[in-house]
Structures are given as C-alpha cells and as structure tokens.
C-alpha cells in the first residue's frame, strides 16, 4: 500500500500478518485485525523512528489498485466500486460538451466519497426530481448480471427502488438494444437511499456495470462500462 502522511509525504509498504513466512512460522496465522500490520519500506525500529517520518494517527493508507485491462476487454482492479461509474459520468459530461448534446432537463452530476459510511447522498439540489445512483452492479450466485452487462437494481437491503423510474430505465435499455439485467441485491446500500433518509421527496434508482468480487480484487468488462454509459446517456438526453 501507499501511506500518505499529514504533511503530504508519501511512503510505501506492504500489508502482512505477523507471521507471513510459511518456511518460518510453525502454524498458519489467520488474517484478522489483531494480527495484521503495515510493514513500511523504511528503516524504522521504534515509535520514535515512525514519528520522525511524520506518520501519525489519522493518516491515509491506500492500497495499490493493481489495475489491468486485458485484450479481451476485462478490467481487473481494486476500487472498481466505484471508480468505474465515476469514469462513466465524467465521460458523459465530456460527451455533452464535445458533441454539443442538448439536455432536455436539468442534470446534476454529484460525486461523493461517503457512500460506504451511509451519508453520501444526504444532500442534492433542492429542485431534484429523480436521483439515479450510478454505482456497481452485483455479479454472483442467483443474480442475472455478468461483468459485460449493465445492472438495473429493483431492490436492495434498503427496500425497493422507485417502480416508475426502474421501468423507464428498463424501457430505455430495451429501446437501445443494451445488454442488461434486473436484479435484487441482498447486501447493498446506495447513495440515493441516504437522499431519501435526508427527507428528499424524489424518485430513486440504481444502476451500474457488473462487477465481480466486490470489495476485493474486482473484475468487470468494457462491455459493462459501455452498456452503462449508453443507458445513462440515452436516459438523460431523451
């Protein structure tokens, strides 16, 4: 991982358990919070050495994403949830500008880094009527989505999404011949649910490219990205 200190210095290191060497340790050590550590790529022996580097409580540790895009179109990386959809929305903004696309409604693009802690969508412009969370689509057992599709979520752990909005997204996907799946996510929450909890009276929806092995070393596909991009673009321009 990379560690960024409070004075913006950057250090590298590795995440290991306390007995990582199979040829040395007597028993296998499970990866739990109690026995995992950050091994800095610095010559340090004690707390004073660490302090001298400017490293302190509250500093950020960022894992190497290890991003790979294969010739067959697969995208492998950490943090595809939700870097992929951020790229999709930035691509949409660029297309609107470069191609002179006319939008027939007001469209706001909101980026948040707080979805995982529950309050990412707690603010939206006051005149918002619909809110679509462009997040990741789930891929796994009992789900129809693959990495090459755009997933349209009908319901997650927070309950069902707005039926009329989901129906409109499905009809748009069908009209444009997009490869999509409608799924229910059993262990999932999105920014737009925070919007509802904040008291906004809106229609809410959730879509995203299929991502396998979420919150892990994740995998998606360029086709899933393209299908999601085309769905968002078609929906906001028609």
PLM feature spans:
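N-terminal hydrophobic/helix-forming segments and targeting peptides
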Residues: 3-238
